Amino acid sequence: MKSLGIVIPSFNELESLRVLVPTCINLLTENPNLQIVIVDNGSNDGTNLYLEMYSDIERFKYLILEANQGYGGGILAGLNQLETEYLSWTHADLQTDIFDIFKFDLNSLPDYFLAKGIRRGRSVSDYIFTFGMTFYILLKFRRFCNDINGQPTIISRKLFYQFNYPPSDFSFDLYAFIMAKKMNSLIIRKKIHFSDRRYSHSKWNFGFTSKINLIIRTLKFSNSLKRYLND
């Protein structure tokens, strides 16, 4: 397998990181072609102090952002730190297992590809929300993009080089998916179990109102992305 980099953005996820980081260290020991970057995206729970304990681990990086740069901004900052041929991102909240990345067959892939999990085990309301967004994107872009925010996501470096001013919010996943479709990339999907949070709480999903706000932001961004693709 070619070299793989994993970006894990976090915002006030210290308790989850206490579980996740030792697992990351073990993965690095077992996989010499692996690099991991954890992005502390403006946390105020002591995440930076915890990550500093691992400053001497080879191929393990941490990036401290003093102010929160948004979901997409944190991921992009981490991706720019990677030196690997394949790049990926997943969340620090433990709702998916970092080992899920290795469920994808990353051998003999073309220059342009996107691999992404399809979340299973979610609530009915979340499934309805995802279906609605999938249907809207299909109508808007004439491209089928199911479960846009599924985890994890893995892309080729050549696809990443096509990213031009991606959004800094939760539209980042939509942008990556649409760019992959635009470049006629191979799309690989795999069902991934999605668990409840062990610690903390979602930083955006507080119920119906937060979903409506996310929909509005996504609709606005999709309009600007549509104009960009038509230029």
Language-model regions, residue ranges each:
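Hydrophobic helical membrane-anchoring modules
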Residues: 1, 15, 165-231
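Cell-envelope/extracellular polymer assembly enzymes that use nucleotide-activated donors
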Residues: 3-5, 35, 175
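Donor nucleotide-sugar binding loop of glycosyltransferases
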Residues: 13-17, 43, 71, 97
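Short, well-formed alpha-helical segments that are part of the catalytic scaffolds
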Residues: 13-27
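Conserved donor nucleotide-binding strand/loop of the catalytic core
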Residues: 34, 48-81
